[in-house]
Amino acid sequence: MAVSAEQEVRSFEVVKEEKIAASVEVVFETILEQMGPYNETPDGTSLAMKLEAWPGGRWYRDLGKDSGHFWGHVQAIKPPTLLEICGPLFMSFPAISNVQYRLTEEGGLTRLKFVHRAMGLIPSEVIEGERSVHNGWSYIVRRIRERAEGRQNADGGKK
């Protein structure tokens, strides 16, 4: 029988706010796509993510042949202003997360407030350093803004 030393429970909170020159509907649709088919690493590698966009729906990485990774469940969804996910996300260790995307219209722009809170036996490199969760979410929020603004411009401001 193996016994290990006590591990430290850590928590973190990532908060990102972004003003996006696109309608709230376009931004919400873009978030759903970014979490699903357009989810990729900064080097452009697809993560093959699937999002079932309804209460209780799964968010998971589909590697085919009944293989993959469960990331979370849709805890709340109120199109086009709220998407909330709970689950372990990318963490393959004892941890739980809550992720919120909240959208509000402000003066012709959409304000995206993104929050990721987590707690568990989280290694310090997840919280700090080059490959931290903060850097990963910064990339994703930036991609949402770029894609939503590109869609808004391509649609001629419709929606």
State where each predicted segment sits:
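Short beta-edge strand/loop motif at the mouth of beta-sheet-based domains
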Residues: 15, 33-70, 80-82, 155-159
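A structural signal for short, well-ordered beta-strand segments
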Residues: 16-18, 101, 114-116
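Conserved strand-loop elements at the edges of beta-sheets that form or border functional pockets
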Residues: 20-22, 53, 76
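A conserved amphipathic terminal alpha-helix motif
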Residues: 118-159
